[in-house]
């Protein structure tokens, strides 16, 4: 899985730095990006899906910020659903972008393609088929609605 891939890549980089032989370092760095992002996004996704993950509409500061940055909660939700609906699968993310000091929705493929540098994920929805197909079949929209 992602943790094993990340750990193996980190070990390769440590060994290469120690020996001075950089053969394989470029592939290991790509593996750190792919497996690290895969691990971090799944970790956030499962935290969001737990009973303590909240559920329902946000309240307080997060709700206020969504309304400020997207115009309304409904506007944010419609855009987030669009991020989750692209045919290639991947991730729909609500992130905080410290450069623009705004919340943004992102559609990210392959864990790290389409990521926004410096953005901090707040909400992650895994829309790869393995996340919904067993329960929802090809109805990704039903999974997103749930």
From Swiss-Prot:
Listed cofactors: Mn(2+)
Pfam families reported in the protein's UniProt record: Sod_Fe_C, Sod_Fe_N
Segments traversing the membrane: none
Sorted UniProt keywords: Manganese, Metal-binding, Oxidoreductase
Gene3D superfamilies: Fe,Mn superoxide dismutase (SOD) domain, Iron/manganese superoxide dismutase, C-terminal domain
Database matches in InterPro entries: Fe/Mn_Superoxide_Dismutase (IPR050265), Mn/Fe_SOD_BS (IPR019833), Mn/Fe_SOD_C (IPR019832), Mn/Fe_SOD_N (IPR019831), Mn/Fe_SOD_N_sf (IPR036324), SOD_C_sf (IPR036314)
Reactions mediated catalytically: 2 superoxide + 2 H(+) = H2O2 + O2
Domain of life, per lineage: Archaea
EC number: 1.15.1.1
SUPFAM superfamilies: Fe,Mn superoxide dismutase (SOD), C-terminal domain (SSF54719), Fe,Mn superoxide dismutase (SOD), N-terminal domain (SSF46609)
Class of the enzyme per the UniProt entry, highest EC level: oxidoreductase
Cofactor note text: Binds 1 Mn(2+) ion per subunit.
GO molecular function: metal ion binding; superoxide dismutase activity
Residues involved in Mn(2+) binding: 42, 126, 130
PANTHER family the UniProt entry points to: SUPEROXIDE DISMUTASE 2, SUPEROXIDE DISMUTASE [MN], MITOCHONDRIAL
Protein function: Destroys superoxide anion radicals which are normally produced within the cells and which are toxic to biological systems.
Family statement: Belongs to the iron/manganese superoxide dismutase family.
Protein name: Superoxide dismutase [Mn] 2
Gene transcribed to yield this protein: sod2
């Amino acid at each position: 899985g992602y943790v094993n891939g990340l750990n193996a890549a980190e070990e390769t980089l440590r060994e290469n730095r120690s020996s001075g032989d950089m053969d394989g370092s470029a592939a290991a760095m790509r593996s750190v990006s792919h497996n690290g992002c895969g691990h971090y996004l799944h970790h956030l996704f499962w935290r969001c899906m737990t009973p303590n993950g909240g559920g329902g509409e946000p309240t307080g500061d997060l709700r206020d910020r969504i309304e400020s940055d997207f115009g309304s909660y409904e506007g944010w939700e419609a855009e987030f659903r669009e991020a989750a609906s692209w045919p290639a699968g991947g991730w729909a993310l609500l992130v905080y972008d410290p450069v623009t000091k705004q919340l943004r929705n992102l559609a990210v493929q392959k864990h790290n393609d389409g990521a926004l540098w410096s953005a901090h994920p707040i909400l992650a929805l895994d829309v790869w088929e393995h996340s919904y197909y067993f329960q929802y079949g090809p109805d990704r929209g039903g999974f997103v609605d749930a």
